[in-house]
């Protein structure tokens, strides 16, 4: 029988069918090749939006810089970055007036964080531009390399382990006339293999010292590397995102800590909360506007869209905001917060890998690195690329483009939200001094504006005033893409509101299925996702039951663990059948061992091992959960583990799931082919770190391990701990006098060695 799909929606309000319009099934698009073109687009667009600003030259690096602040206001709707300083400061003052003490309290909270944050905060995060190697690296490695270079250049404040001391080193490094770095390089030589007598290429890794003068170092310290944003759904064109280096990251972190603290106190801010908490916050604002508009007023809501939010923001504006927010604070605190925007005003965008050329006739491929774009003959390029390169050439220095205006994606989400909320705050009647008033929601570049007025003319006037106020602060509401509707129906950060939030289930689709961590975690994550969606996303019981059956089927195919009594033949079926036949209580076998599925929608919260424990044969229990079993990883089994889920929009979310350590909680081994590459030096560093950390953990078992707030190095902490433990053990008779003396002697020797160093 054919079903007419439109019949499905007859009883459903349009908003509830929103899920069907989202591009979230199937694989998202990924980018291939270099991001150079996208980065040039960003740089050129940003300059175009601020083109009527003032040009200056950076005295240290010689980079040309464009400053649009207080520039001419646009006469038309074109997006522009000409924010007016006095307007921004006034908006901040009004924000403070309506929230007495908000800035002061946030500063006090932030000061506490600044003094306690450890430098290892910077190891969080994925790819980071490593200025010592001039390419991207995992955050922890980039930080290690930076600290190593700092120490070899005599910058040792970072040894305290506090982030603020590491930042002191960063500031001092910028005053140095030269900085010496170590670069890794590869030597190849042909040698004859003794056994096979064939010639083979032998690779050795060399390290060589290399000096950067002040200008080169500053350029690297101010560089943001760029890459293409992957897996963006619903877009035809890719776009560039930035990864800043370690010099900038710490300063940005403190600014964002302050801004986050402010956002938490603002009812219009969609950050830093998420999920149901965010929905509740938004629903409150809507309720407030609707209750006040019942009798005499009409109320409209704009589902807002801003044109190129990042490219029209300006770090100089953020500096003005920070200066105002921290106005009565200690000098050191104001200084440390003002460095991030200053660095961003002088930032350089690295153009990425460059362009790939191939000649069809000669079957040749060659890469033109970004450094060559400044003076290569343009006849090789097509017209659009030619235009891009011509435009960007005046800005190029050593393969990086000077990019003073604009903020790269995702750098100051919290602070830019504060700026947006300050405009929403101006909608109160005491500020508009007329019959219309507004309120709304802001989350980074996304906003929803609710306007109330006695009549349509008032609504129009309110929207116009909001639009013009935004222009004064360098925010460009897009008239083409924003949409106005009677209050009660709008969209904000992909939440659809229709007299209450509608579940947008399609957003969750990517997280259904088998994650691919290991058999144990995947089972747990799979059922947790279904459970969470029943709680948060209107996933009904029948659909959930179906999702569960599909998940189990998917899981069995992934791990080839079909039931022991099935006819399906896989690589594992021989072993699984054998286990099935020798098991008395077959219901006790885990699904991953060919057992039946005992999950239904009522018991999704129970880990599978616990669900089946009473049903298991004793010898199966013993094999499954035996601490001496060589296949069980006992690295760190917490009762709750975190899986990184990739939701449809927004950053990867941490999702908690129950973890029970069994033979199925294996951790796959690292691919060893890295040993033949220039990354080998990095691997050795990592192993050294691993050893140090393991040693440290032996001294401080997790129960007693509190991060030291005082300033002491790992070695000092370990030595003092060893002395305390030794004394306790000696006094309680657990160790002999000779052993005690030996430990004390070793501790003194270590301290002497440290002093000599």
Curated annotation (Swiss-Prot):
Residues 53-82 are annotated as: Disordered. GO terms for molecular function: nucleotide binding; RNA binding; RNA-directed RNA polymerase activity. Its main location: host cell. It is an enzyme of class 2 (transferase). It catalyses: RNA(n) + a ribonucleoside 5'-triphosphate = RNA(n+1) + diphosphate. InterPro entries: RNA-dir_pol_NSvirus (IPR007099), RNA_pol_PB1_influenza (IPR001407). Influenza RNA polymerase is composed of three subunits: PB1, PB2 and PA. Interacts (via N-terminus) with PA (via C-terminus). Interacts (via C-terminus) with PB2 (via N-terminus); this interaction is essential for transcription initiation. Interacts (via C-terminus) with human PKP2 (via N-terminus); the interaction competitively inhibits the interaction between the RNA polymerase subunits PB1 and PB2. This is RNA-directed RNA polymerase catalytic subunit.
